[in-house]
Amino acid sequence: MNKNQLKKLNPQQRAAVRYGQGPLLVIAGAGTGKTTVITERIKYLIVSKKLKPAEILALTFTDKAAGEMEERVDLAMPYGYTDMWISTFHSFCDRVLRQEALQIGLNANYQLMGGAETTQFLINHLFKFKLGYYRPLGNPTQFVEGLLQHFSRLKDEDIQPSEYVHWVKANSLQLGTDNQKKYLELATAYQTYEELKTQKDVMDFGDLITRVLQLFRTRPNILRQYQQKFKYLLIDEFQDTNIAQNELVRLLAGKQANLTVVADDDQAIYRWRGAATANVIQFRRNFPKAKLITLTQNYRSTQEILDRAYQLIQHNNPDRLEVKEKINKKLVSARQVVGQPIKLILTGRLEDEAEAVAKKISGLTKKKYQYQDIALLVRANNHAEAFTRALSRAGIPYQFLGPGQLFRQPEVKDLIAYLKLLDNFEDGPAVYRVLSMGVFGLSGRDLAAISNFARRQNMAFFEACEQADQVFLNQEAREKIKKFVQMVHRHLDLLVKETAGQILYYFLQDSGLLEQLTDYKTVAQEKQAQNIAKLFDRLKSYEAAHEDASVQATVAWISLAMERGESPLAGTTDWVAENKVNLLTIHSAKGLEFPVVFLVNLVSGRFPTRERQEQIPIPDELIKEILPEGDYHLQEERRLNFFRLSKTPGRKTIISRQ
C-alpha cells in the first residue's frame, strides 16, 4: 500500500485501517472521515494482506453509498478490481437468493414487490386470511396498512410466524381471552401472508433478509461456503442495522470474525425503519474480543458547533455508548477556526418565524453569501409550507431538495391523469388536467366554457367535451376538443387487450407529445423527457411482475404508491449549480453540507415530534432489541438534531422557533 496515503491519515484512522484479524468496532463521529477509513481499509487488505477483491464483502444501506464506496476503491486501486462485493444489505441478499433459492424451495425468478405492490397483494387476497377483528365488515381494508407494517416489524425483529404462534399459545393465560384471540389472529395472518407469497413467487423487501437467514440456518454447508468465500466483512452505518441484519452479519462473520463495523450510536436516526441502536451498544457483548477505535478528529465543523452538538446529546445518557464503554467521543475540530456562536430567532407564531427567516436570508445575500449557500432544514415535508410562502413573498428563489418523487413531477402527473381518465371518464379533475396540457393548445377560457356547460347540463366534464358543438367555443377550439375525444375513444377500445404502458405510448404518439419530448430545447425540457422515460421504465417493470397490468390495475397501484408517499425517484437537479435557497428535510440532508444552515420550527409537537404510534404494535415480550432506559422517542429526536448540527460546516447556524 502507498505509504504516502497512510501518512495522510491521523493516528486513529491509521490504526483502524491497519488493524489485523478479528472483530473491530470503529466509532466514527460526524465528519471524522469514516468513508476514507473504509475504502483505505479495503485497499490495505488487498495490497498488504494479499486478499483477492472477491474475498471482501462490504455492506451499506443505500445504493448511493455503495456506489460511492465502489468508485473510491476503483479509483484508488492501481490495477482496478473485479468481483468485489460492495452493495446494500438487500442487494447482497437478492444476489444470494437468485443463486441459492432452490435450496429452500423457492423460485429463483421471484418478483420483488415494493410497498404499494404489497398493499395491492394483501387487498387482492384479503379474504383468504382468517380475519375477524382485523377485517371489520363495514371497512374490510381498514387494517391493511397496519397489518403490513406489523409483518414488516416482525421481520425486522427476526420473528418467524411459528415463533409468534408459539408465544401466543404459551401466554394465553396472561394475555386473557380477548387479547389472545387478537394476537392469534395476527400470528395466523402472518403465517398466511408468508405462505401466499411463496405460492405466488413474490417477495417483499423484508423477505430478502429473512429468507437468507433461513437459508444459512437450515443449510449450514451453504453458510460455510459464504464464510469461506468472504475472508473479511466491512459494515458501514452499523447503527442503522435492525435485529435481522445484525444476525445476518453475525452468521457471515463466523468463528474467524474478521469483521469491521463502522458506527456512531449518536447518529442512529432510523428507528422508525426498524434500526436497533442496541446492535452498536451490544457489539462487544456479541464479540468479546472486539477492538474498539474511536475517531474524534472532525474535518468539517467549527469547535463551536461541535461543542453545542455534544452538549445536546449528553441528555441521552446513560444509554449512549460513550457511557456504556467509558470512552471519550467528544469531537475536536481540525479547522483552525473557533466559529460563530449559534444564533437564535424567537417569534410568537409560525408565520412570524417564516417572515423572520426570509428577512434574515435577504440580509445574508446582500453581504457575502449566495442563495445556494443557504439551507433551511425542516423535520418533515409538510412543515415547509409557511417558509416557501415567506420566501416567495420576499422574492427569494428556492428549491425543495431531497429524493424527488417521480409520480409527483408535473409532466408525470399529466400522464397519470390520462390513465385515470381512461379508468374513469367521470374523473373531472383528470380530464381537466389532461386538456390543460400545452400540446392540446386550449386556453383557460376554453376550459372554463366546457366546465360551465357541464355544470349547467349536470354532466361529467368529458361528456361535455363529447358535445363540444353545443359549447360556446370558437371553431378552432371545437376541432381540437373533437380530435381529443376521438383519441380517447380509440384508446378506450384498447383497454381489454393492451397494457397501461402501451396505451400511454399511443397517447404520446397521437397527441404529438412524443415529437415534443424528442426535440427538447432547454435543460428543463430534457429533465421532463427523462422523467417520462423513467415512468415508462417503471411501467415496464410493473408489467413484467404482474399478470394484470391493465389501466385499472396500474392506476390502483400508482394511487396506492402516492397515498403511501412512495414513488421511484425523479431526476435530481444539480444542487450546486442552482443559485437558490435549499429547502429540505433533515433526513434527506444526509451527505450534504451548506455554509449557512437554518434549523427551523423547533417547537414541541413539530421538532421534537409527537411519537408516532404503530397501528398494530409488536408485543414488548417479542422484541429482541434491548430497549434503552430513557424515552427512546425523545432520544431519537435528540439524535436527529445532533445529526444535523454536527454535519454543519458552521460558518453560520441559525435556529428559529416560536
Model-inferred region functions:
Residues 89-93, 184-232, 242-248, 358, ...:
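Conserved helicase/translocase P-loop NTPase motor core
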Residues 164, 179, 314-319, 370, ...:
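Conserved helicase C-terminal RecA-like lobe
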Residues 1-108, 112, 119, 224, ...:
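P-loop NTPase Walker
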Residues 52-63, 84-86, 236, 262, ...:
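Conserved RecA-like ASCE P-loop NTPase motor core of nucleic-acid helicases/translocases
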Residues 6-10, 14-28, 54, 104-112, ...:
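Inter-lobe coupling/hinge region of RecA-like P-loop helicase motors
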Residues 19-20, 81-84, 102-207, 230, ...:
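ATP-hydrolysis module of ASCE/P-loop NTPase motor domains
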Residues 132-145, 161-167, 296-348, 365-371, ...:
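Coupling/hinge elements of helicase-like and P-loop NTPase modules
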Residues 2-8, 24, 32-34, 40, ...:
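Conserved RecA-like helicase ATPase core segment
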